[in-house]
């Protein structure tokens, strides 16, 4: 293995078509609140908005639970600084009854956040469609987490297929010390009691255990240096405190171009580092089956 080869064959992205929006999650979120949004649709275009708002909340107090999502907030409690420089907290938990004073506060929320103008002046036609759009926008915040999941899934499919092809190999996804002991009877010594590995692969023929971590970095940052340092120490610990156990780090992404030195230090210290191209070319298979 050559360090320059690792750097020169890093991927720009691992995004797939289903990376951008998690439609299933959004549809499920909408389904939970759809009826209440339809109730609120009644307020669209109402001239005497405040009066209608009061009547609606008297009859259907449960609709307050969907107010936060109308301004792209997931919390059921919102605290703001009012005009008197005092903190004001509104709760949006389900209630069976609302007093006039409470409804007045919710009306103020509607008015001050611009929701009254949105509905009264027919700037939207349907709150279900509107919230669907809000959910799509909010879902983009989850993309960072999805990159990590994507990397795991790519490697998981590869390891799954490898284990099907080679009956001597077995694996655990999200492996802990206890899961490894339970499945293969191996007593691991680890640096942290709660240490979890993305994968553990056991070769029944050689009785060797492989502990695998995977990640992808499209951009730079201090996280890369910290990760390289952590895995360098982890590899050393595993090597010094266990027999027939090897740590493998599968990482990729152009972010490593901004942190070549920490990665090289880990490589030079003996950490087995692979990127996805190397996995595709069979290097992981070679290590696990040798």
UniProtKB/Swiss-Prot annotation:
Similarity comment text for this entry: Belongs to the DpnII type II restriction endonuclease family.
Assigned EC number: 3.1.21.4
Top class in the EC scheme: hydrolase
Molecular function GO terms recorded: DNA binding; type II site-specific deoxyribonuclease activity
Function: A P subtype restriction enzyme that recognizes the double-stranded sequence 5'-GATC-3'; the cleavage site is unknown.
Reactions the enzyme catalyzes: Endonucleolytic cleavage of DNA to give specific double-stranded fragments with terminal 5'-phosphates
A Pfam family hit: DpnII
Swiss-Prot/TrEMBL GO biological process terms: DNA restriction-modification system
Swiss-Prot/TrEMBL keywords: DNA-binding, Endonuclease, Hydrolase, Nuclease, Restriction system
Protein's recorded name: Type II restriction enzyme MjaIII
Organism: Methanocaldococcus jannaschii (strain ATCC 43067 / DSM 2661 / JAL-1 / JCM 10045 / NBRC 100440) (Methanococcus jannaschii)
Origin: domain of life: Archaea
């Amino acid at each position: 293995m050559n360090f320059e080869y690792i750097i020169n064959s890093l991927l720009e992205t691992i995004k797939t078509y289903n990376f951008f929006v998690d439609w299933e999650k959004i549809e499920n979120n909408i389904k939970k609140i759809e009826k209440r949004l339809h109730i609120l649709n009644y307020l669209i275009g109402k001239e005497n908005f405040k009066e209608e708002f009061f009547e609606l909340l008297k009859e259907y107090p449960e609709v307050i639970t969907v107010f936060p999502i109308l301004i792209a907030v997931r919390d059921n409690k919102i605290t703001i600084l009012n005009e008197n420089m005092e903190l004001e907290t509104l709760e949006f938990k389900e209630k069976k009854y609302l007093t006039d004073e409470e409804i007045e506060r919710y009306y103020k929320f509607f008015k001050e956040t611009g929701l009254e103008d949105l509905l009264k002046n027919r700037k939207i036609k349907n709150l279900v469609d509107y919230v669907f759009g809000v959910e799509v926008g909010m879902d983009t915040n989850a993309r960072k987490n999805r990159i990590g999941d994507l990397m795991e899934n790519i490697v998981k499919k590869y390891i799954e297929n490898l284990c099907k092809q080679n009956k001597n190999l077995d694996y655990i996804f999200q492996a802990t010390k206890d899961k490894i002991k339970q499945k293969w009877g191996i007593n691991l010594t680890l640096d942290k009691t709660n240490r979890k590995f993305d994968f553990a692969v056991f070769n029944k023929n050689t009785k060797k255990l492989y502990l695998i971590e995977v990640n992808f970095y499209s951009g730079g940052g201090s996280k890369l240096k910290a990760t390289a340092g952590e895995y360098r120490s982890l590899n050393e610990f595993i090597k010094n405190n266990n027999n027939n156990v090897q740590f493998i780090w599968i990482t990729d992404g152009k972010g490593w171009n901004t942190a070549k030195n920490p990665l090289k230090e880990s490589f030079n210290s003996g950490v087995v580092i692979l990127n996805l191209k190397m996995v595709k070319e069979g290097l992981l298979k070679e290590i696990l089956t040798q």
